[in-house]
Amino acid sequence: MAHKKGGGSTHNGRDSKPKMLGVKKFGGELISAGAIIVRQRGTKFHPGVNVGIGKDHTLFALVDGHVAFTTKGAMNKPTVNVATA
């Protein structure tokens, strides 16, 4: 017989790496075309003027300019715009 109990096993011991989501450029900041403004899951922020959306819902600038956060429509959806400099 063993004089110590077996070590056993566990079902834990793993974790996913951070996804680095969130707002990367804030209102009023000067950005260049192609710069990422928001990384998100789903459309918490919607693309507005001069803003594109990637397949993972990342919002990015289509032109050089200043970032502006507004709300749009009857549902007051948060929208990101880029005003040309």
UniProtKB/Swiss-Prot annotation:
Domain of life the protein comes from: Bacteria
Keywords tagged on the record: Ribonucleoprotein, Ribosomal protein
Alphabetized PROSITE patterns for the sequence: RIBOSOMAL_L27
Gene Ontology terms describing biological process: translation
Pfam families from the UniProt entry: Ribosomal_L27
SUPFAM superfamilies: Ribosomal L27 protein-like (SSF110324)
Gene Ontology annotations for the cellular component aspect, listed alphabetically: cytosolic large ribosomal subunit
Chain spans, region Disordered: 1-21
GO molecular function: structural constituent of ribosome
Family indicated by similarity: Belongs to the bacterial ribosomal protein bL27 family.
HAMAP family for the chain: Ribosomal_bL27
UniProt cross-references to PANTHER family, sorted A to Z: LARGE RIBOSOMAL SUBUNIT PROTEIN BL27M, RIBOSOMAL PROTEIN L27
NCBIfam families in the cross-refs: L27
Protein name per its UniProtKB record: Large ribosomal subunit protein bL27
Native source organism of the sequence: Albidiferax ferrireducens (strain ATCC BAA-621 / DSM 15236 / T118) (Rhodoferax ferrireducens)
Lineage, top ranks: Bacteria, Pseudomonadati, Pseudomonadota, Betaproteobacteria, Burkholderiales
Record gene name: rpmA
